[in-house]
From Swiss-Prot:
This is Uracil phosphoribosyltransferase. 5-phospho-alpha-D-ribose 1-diphosphate binds at residues 79, 104, 131-139, 200. HAMAP family: Upp_B. One of its GO terms (molecular function) is GTP binding. The gene is upp. It catalyses: UMP + diphosphate = 5-phospho-alpha-D-ribose 1-diphosphate + uracil. The lineage of its organism: Bacteria, Bacillati, Bacillota, Bacilli, Lactobacillales. NCBIfam families: PRK00129.1 (NF001097), upp (TIGR01091). Its cofactor is Mg(2+).
Length: 209
């Protein structure tokens, strides 16, 4: 079973409180979502493999460490996942980007994939799927399925807030995927939103409500 980890660093928790507030505007919401994404990336990438590399400093040659193998691929789920992307890239600027477009049917709450674009060698890369909210788990599971269909074997999921129902759904369908969250929230409401949650993260990020 993949692990579920709440990243309870004080800075993450402080910033999460700010974006939970209903009166936080889009500009501040967008900035802080990116900041939390970066802070979470620092913790999530602790186990990236390193290799020795010979370099030359102003003082002479030396052997130092750098990330081994293919670079990490960040996979934001459109559209809300884009809010976390820049923060992650600030921590791992060499990362590649794959984009998955998903939309949720307002009546059935089921997700549908409408777009997928990724590096050609994505099957050889570790992928970090990012989306601010893990609600029913449908979008996350569909995104993970889209990656696995293309041969990806090493997948992690990073979200800001997670409902117990979404955590369970991902762990049952994808027991090989580790989930990282800034918070495990109380529950999923009948309308498909997380409580206490963030509201509609996509609308708040892009000012479309």
């Amino acid at each position: 079973m993949g692990k579920f980890v709440v990243l309870d660093h004080p800075l993450i928790q402080h910033k999460l409180t700010i974006i939970r507030r209903k009166d936080t505007g889009s500009n501040e919401f967008r900035r802080i979502v990116g900041e939390i994404g970066g802070l979470m990336t620092y913790e999530i990438t602790r186990d990236l493999p390193l290799e020795d590399v010979e370099i030359e400093t102003p003082m002479g040659k030396t052997v130092q460490k750098e990330i081994a193998g293919k670079k990490l691929t960040i996979v934001p789920i459109l559209r809300a996942g884009m809010g976390m992307l820049n923060g992650v890239l600030e921590m791992v600027p060499s990362a590649k980007i794959a984009v998955i477009g998903m939309y949720r049917d307002e009546e059935t709450l089921k997700p549908h994939e409408y777009f997928f674009k990724a590096p050609k060698d994505i099957a050889e890369r570790e992928c970090l799927v990012v989306d601010p909210m893990l609600a029913t788990g449908g979008s996350a599971n569909d995104a993970i399925a889209a990656l696995k269909k293309r041969g990806v074997k090493d997948i992690k999921l990073a979200v800001l807030v997670a409902a117990p129902e979404g955590i369970k759904a991902v762990q049952e369908e994808n027991p090989d995927v580790d989930i990282y969250a800034a918070s495990e929230d109380d529950k999923l409401l009948d309308n498909g939103y997380i409580f206490p949650g963030l509201g509609d993260a996509g609308d708040r990020l892009f000012g479309t409500k």
